[in-house]
């Protein structure tokens, strides 16, 4: 089955890829023979036309069919030969066609392919009509067979004739090819190279690429063999980083404090405390920053009023508590004397002992609690031993 598909990748110009599915060996061999026969017939017609033009004899029947114009007949024969060669070895060229334009031609593998004479006649008629139209200055009448043959056998002519539209980029311009020109089939030797004349390759290079850099060497080295493979869309002009909608791709906003200051953003802030900040480069997103950058207290700061936290003294803290300092003998003597008088201290006595021993009221209260617990343990131990 022969298929001609126009793909629409994400390129500047649409690219045409011609795929040939080798349904059976006999059909493929017969098609090749027909193409060779068409090329031979076209070459014979060209030779006859040239002989008739040079020797002054009677024109060839192909020339007579073209209206006695020997140049038209020669052009038709040459076009038929080129069309046969192009139909046999098609390569993928970026054709500046309309995005919606697509053409598909198929022939079932079981059907008999057209004969060589019919193919040559159709190609010659199409080329003769085109030459007559160009010589007369107007669009000459073209039959359906000629248009069909022109569309089917001249895929590369669209790229060569599009001088008004933007020039498409060739293979190797972005570091990767467009599409492979290969014959797909079950046989291992199904992939064949697409050979074209050096003049056509040079004209294509002069028109569609800059031949001043290393790309020219690559193109010239591949002018005779274009059996390359498509490397994917990795090097395409549209294959760049595109941010996913709903996500913001930008670096972290630096802190508003000093270089050594740590930021602790409070959790659960309402959206009213944020104001939108327009982003550069035209991104369709907004970043929200708090209006007031508050500095909450450190988590390890003690809740006691008499404890002062210092970052330099962090090693002396344990879970936010001050390191235990044993009481002096003078302090213990004053506390023991008051405990012997009364095991439960009053508010006035607590203030007096705090002022005398240079201890806080909380420390005095805790000492009395611990002293009662200690005495209780001692009494319980004596009871158990006795």
Curated annotation (Swiss-Prot):
Belongs to the Abd-B homeobox family. Gene3D superfamilies: Homeodomain-like. This is Homeobox protein Hox-A13. Sequence-specific, AT-rich binding transcription factor which is part of a developmental regulatory system that provides cells with specific positional identities on the anterior-posterior axis. GO terms for biological process: anatomical structure morphogenesis; animal organ morphogenesis; artery morphogenesis; branching involved in prostate gland morphogenesis; embryonic forelimb morphogenesis; embryonic hindgut morphogenesis; endothelial cell fate specification; endothelial cell morphogenesis. It holds the Pfam family HoxA13_N. InterPro entries: AP_axis_regulatory_Homeobox (IPR051003), HD (IPR001356), Homeobox_CS (IPR017970), Homeodomain-like_sf (IPR009057), HoxA13_N (IPR022067). Residues 320-379 bind DNA. Binds DNA as a homodimer. Interacts with MEIS1, MEIS2 and MEIS3. The keyword Transcription regulation applies. GO terms for cellular component: chromosome; intermediate filament cytoskeleton; nucleoplasm; nucleus. It comes from Mus musculus. Its main location: nucleus. It is linked to Defects in Hoxa13 are the cause of hypodactyly (Hd), a condition characterized by profound deficiency of digital arch structures. It is found in: Nucleus. GO terms for molecular function: cis-regulatory region sequence-specific DNA binding; DNA binding; DNA-binding transcription activator activity, RNA polymerase II-specific; DNA-binding transcription factor activity; RNA polymerase II cis-regulatory region sequence-specific DNA binding; transcription cis-regulatory region binding. Keywords: Developmental protein, DNA-binding, Homeobox, Nucleus, Transcription, Transcription regulation. The keyword Lyase does not apply.
């Amino acid at each position: 089955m022969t298929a001609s598909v126009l793909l629409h990748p994400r390129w500047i110009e649409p690219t045409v890829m011609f795929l040939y599915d080798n349904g059976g060996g006999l059909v493929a061999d017969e098609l090749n023979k027909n193409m060779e026969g068409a090329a031979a017939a076209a070459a014979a017609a060209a030779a006859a036309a040239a002989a008739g033009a040079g020797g002054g004899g009677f024109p060839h029947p192909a020339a007579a069919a073209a209206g006695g114009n020997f140049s038209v007949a020669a052009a038709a024969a040459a076009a038929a030969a080129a069309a046969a060669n192009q139909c046999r070895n098609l390569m993928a060229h970026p054709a500046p066609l309309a995005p919606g334009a697509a053409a598909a031609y198929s022939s079932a593998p079981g059907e008999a392919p057209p004969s060589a004479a019919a193919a040559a006649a159709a190609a010659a008629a199409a080329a003769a009509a085109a030459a007559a139209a160009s010589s007369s200055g107007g669009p000459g009448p073209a039959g359906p067979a000629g248009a069909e043959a022109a569309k089917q056998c001249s895929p590369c002519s669209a790229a060569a004739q599009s001088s008004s539209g933007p020039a498409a980029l060739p293979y190797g311009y972005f570091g990767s090819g467009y599409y492979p020109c290969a014959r797909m089939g079950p046989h291992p030797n199904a992939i064949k190279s697409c050979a074209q004349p050096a003049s056509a390759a040079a004209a294509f290079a002069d028109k569609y690429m800059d031949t001043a850099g290393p790309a020219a060497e690559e193109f010239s080295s591949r002018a005779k063999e274009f059996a390359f493979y498509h490397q994917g869309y990795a090097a395409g002009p549209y294959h760049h980083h595109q941010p996913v909608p709903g996500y913001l791709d930008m670096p972290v906003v630096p802190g508003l404090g000093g270089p050594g200051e740590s930021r602790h953003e409070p959790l659960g802030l309402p959206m009213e405390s944020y104001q939108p900040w327009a982003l550069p480069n035209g991104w369709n997103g907004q970043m929200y920053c708090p209006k007031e950058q508050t500095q909450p207290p450190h988590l390890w700061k003690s809740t006691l009023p008499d404890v002062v936290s210092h970052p330099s003294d962090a090693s002396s803290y344990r879970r936010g508590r001050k390191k235990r300092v044993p009481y002096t003998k003078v302090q213990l003597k004053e506390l023991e004397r008051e405990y012997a008088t009364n095991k439960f201290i009053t508010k006035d006595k607590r203030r007096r002992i705090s002022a005398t021993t240079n201890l806080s009221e909380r420390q005095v209260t805790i000492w009395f609690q611990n002293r009662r617990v200690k005495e209780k343990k001692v009494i319980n131990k004596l009871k158990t031993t006795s």
